[in-house]
């Protein structure tokens, strides 16, 4: 394993925590803000140093195109992820979802995107076009394409895609003693509480990456 400087270790740990918490890596601007760098360019320099040492892989042209490859020497979180395949993924883009129909129903698919697997923390099943700003403070904006992996269960703190009655929503999951709280990452939006066993709630999947239009 490669020895990292103290600052490089901070950047590496920040990326790892972001992936564990949200399913996708931080942007250069988010790294700079979190670690007190003067600009996103400073974060980029540290990312390139980590890439040269072989502990991350960078996908050109993508603000969140960071993939962890291995844990550095003496890290308490040593691990190795399979290297990204050279084959691109063909992912359906889901636009608006009609009430009562499966999210991957043919009529919901507006087009397909060819995507580099290195953009995602896990293999996604589809892309969902984000509508609204309820997850703004998590770096998810209106018009972004959220990479979703289909799941029937999710961990506390993960960003999930869920059905609530006839609506599909993106929120952060928080488990409560008598149900679930779906947390908005924007103080202008209210959180949503779902009682245990509610027939109105169905988990569709978890976020494993994000693509901003113009990054293709």
Curated annotation (Swiss-Prot):
- S-S bridge residues: none
Any one biological process term the GO annotation gives: DNA repair
| Protein's UniProt keywords contain Repressor | yes
Where exactly is the site Cleavage? 99-100
Q: What keywords sit in the KW lines?
A: Autocatalytic cleavage, DNA damage, DNA repair, DNA replication, DNA-binding, Hydrolase, Repressor, SOS response, Transcription, Transcription regulation
Entry EC no(s): 3.4.21.88
Say which enzyme class the record assigns.
hydrolase
The entry's function note states: Represses a number of genes involved in the response to DNA damage (SOS response), including recA and lexA. In the presence of single-stranded DNA, RecA interacts with LexA causing an autocatalytic cleavage which disrupts the DNA-binding part of LexA, leading to derepression of the SOS regulon and eventually DNA repair.
Q: How does it assemble?
A: Homodimer.
Q: What is this protein called?
A: LexA repressor
Q: Which organism is it from?
A: Paraburkholderia phytofirmans (strain DSM 17436 / LMG 22146 / PsJN) (Burkholderia phytofirmans)
């Amino acid at each position: 394993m490669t020895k990292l400087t103290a600052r490089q270790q901070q950047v590496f740990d920040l990326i790892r925590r972001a992936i564990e918490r949200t399913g996708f890596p931080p942007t250069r601007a988010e790294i700079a803000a979190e670690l007190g760098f003067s600009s996103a360019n400073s974060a980029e320099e540290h990312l390139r140093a980590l890439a040269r040492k072989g502990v991350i892989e960078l996908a050109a042209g993508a603000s969140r195109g960071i993939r962890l490859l291995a844990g550095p020497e003496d890290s308490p979180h040593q691990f190795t992820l399979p290297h990204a395949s050279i084959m691109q993924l063909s992912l359906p883009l889901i636009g608006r979802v009609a009430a009562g129909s499966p999210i991957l129903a043919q009529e919901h698919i507006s087009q397909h995107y060819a995507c580099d697997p290195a953009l995602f923390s896990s293999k996604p099943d589809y892309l969902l076009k984000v509508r609204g700003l309820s997850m703004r403070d998590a770096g998810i904006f209106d018009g972004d394409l959220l990479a979703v992996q289909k799941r029937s269960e999710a961990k506390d703190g993960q960003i999930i895609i869920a059905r609530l009655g006839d609506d599909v929503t993106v929120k952060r999951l928080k488990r409560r003693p008598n149900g679930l709280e779906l947390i908005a990452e924007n103080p202008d939006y209210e959180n949503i509480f779902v009682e245990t066993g509610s027939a109105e709630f169905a988990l569709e999947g978890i976020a494993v990456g994000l693509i901003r239009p113009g990054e293709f």
